[in-house]
Curated annotation (Swiss-Prot):
GO annotation, cellular component aspect: cytoplasm
Keywords from the named record: 4Fe-4S, Cytoplasm, Disulfide bond, Iron, Iron-sulfur, Metal-binding, Methyltransferase, rRNA processing, S-adenosyl-L-methionine, Transferase, tRNA processing
Top-rank taxon, per record: Bacteria
Phylogenetic classification of the source organism: Bacteria, Bacillati, Chloroflexota, Chloroflexia, Chloroflexales
Residues noted as binding [4Fe-4S] cluster in the record, renumbered to the chain: 116, 120, 123
Name under which the protein is recorded: Probable dual-specificity RNA methyltransferase RlmN
GO BP terms in the entry: rRNA base methylation; tRNA methylation
Sequence ranges assigned to domain Radical SAM core in this UniProt record: 102-346
Note: Reaction proceeds by a ping-pong mechanism involving intermediate methylation of a conserved cysteine residue.
Length: 376
């Protein structure tokens, strides 16, 4: 989809582009490195905080926004350890970002599109349809916001930023591949945000061409694939993308990815009561993965996800006994399997619940705090 915004923001520039911009203004290259450090290491909220830059340069930089994201609402759940931000974009589109804090780490769940065009029936974002792709700067700004929140909470740790990032928010990353990958490279850059590649995970509904591209990238970020069914008939019902990329094609791309990268692949499987959680479906899933695995150590992992309620859908959440039975069957077949720890359900921030709206009843929210923009 065509990117609707015309003006570039500071987070849209990599270091080379910032250098070129500032040199076109008559500034030496080292000024760009100083600016880059303020943006990605110091996490400056305002140009006025960049006191080592000349006043004239700061005045000129003040004419360029850091980001287009405007935070309209932040909701808090899980006793303060989960925060969901709703950002408004200049064209009226909205996206959501979720920060989850644990005793030993922090994870931000980032959106790559406003809405989503994949149409998965169990996902709130899929009901919105695709509004537009995000720019690389709009993706990056979400990680900056999360790190600024951590610092405000006094929980940023020695790195001063989030420790993990998952591209599992609104949208399909591989449908916005170029801008998404630009964001990955900027967040990984050791001269800036310096987030390790293996601390980032991208989730896809199974766009085969995207998996093939990722296999050839230089950064070994983690890959998660939304599977959700062991056969084409059911997967096509739940995920329309399967009609274009059926399971056989998806598994072939996955085998090729593992052969090239020797990296483990996670398969996400949301459990729906009476739909895809029967014992025979667990057996079928185990056999599918065993049959599809390349030779050598099994580099597959299944992440079972109890479905989180989405208004307007006839689906139901699997009973816990069915979840544990499903997990045990996979384990018995030698498939590594875990059940995802739930976070943010009460503020509609959990897996599949992001819908970019204010309509969460406030009596389900532990606390609502005033919004803060990424730039102050």
């Amino acid at each position: 989809m065509h990117y609707a915004m015309e003006q570039r923001c500071l987070y849209d520039y990599n270091l080379s582009e910032l250098t070129e911009l500032l040199q076109s203004w008559g500034e030496p290259a080292f000024r760009a490195r100083q600016l880059y450090r303020h943006l990605y290491v110091n996490l400056a909220r305002q140009v006025d905080q960049m006191t080592d830059l000349p006043l004239a340069l700061r005045s000129r930089l003040a004419e360029i926004p850091f980001s287009t994201l405007r935070c309209e609402q932040v909701q808090i759940g899980d006793n303060g350890m989960t925060r969901k931000a709703l950002f408004r974009l200049p064209d009226g589109a909205v996206v959501e970002t979720v920060l989850m804090v644990y005793p030993d780490r922090s994870t931000v769940c980032v959106s790559t599109q406003a809405g989503c065009g994949m149409g998965c029936v169990f996902c709130a974002t899929g009901q919105l349809g695709l509004l537009r792709n995000l720019s690389s700067g709009e993706i990056v700004a979400q990680a900056i916001w999360a790190s600024q929140e951590l610092r405000a909470m006094g929980m940023a740790g020695p790195t001063g930023r989030v420790s993990n990032l998952v591209f599992m928010g609104m949208g399909e990353p591989f449908a916005n591949y170029d801008r998404w990958w630009q964001a990955v490279e900027r967040l990984h850059d050791p001269q800036g945000f310096n987030l390790g590649a293996r601390s980032m995970t991208v989730s896809t509904v199974g766009l085969v061409k995207g998996i093939e591209r990722l296999a050839n990238e230089r950064l070994p970020i983690n890959l998660a694939i939304s599977l959700h069914a062991p056969d084409d008939a059911l997967r096509s019902e739940l995920m329309p993308v399967n009609r274009r990329y059926p399971i056989a094609d998806l598994m072939a791309a996955t085998r090729n990815y593992i052969a090239k990268t020797r990296r483990r692949v996670s398969f996400e499987y949301v459990l729906l009561q009476g739909k895809n959680d029967h014992p025979h479906q667990a057996i079928a899933l185990a056999r599918l993965l065993r049959h599809s695995a390349p030779r050598g150590p099994l580099l597959f992992h299944v992440n079972l996800i109890p479905w989180n309620p989405v208004p307007g859908t006839p689906l139901g959440r699997s009973e816990w006994e069915r979840v544990t039975t499903f997990q045990q069957i996979l384990t018995d077949y030698g498939i590594p399997c875990t059940v995802r720890v739930e976070r943010g359900v009460e503020i509609a921030a959990a897996c599949g619940q992001l819908a970019g709206r204010h309509s969460v009843p406030l009596n389900t929210v532990e606390q609502e705090i005033p919004a803060r923009n990424v730039t102050g």
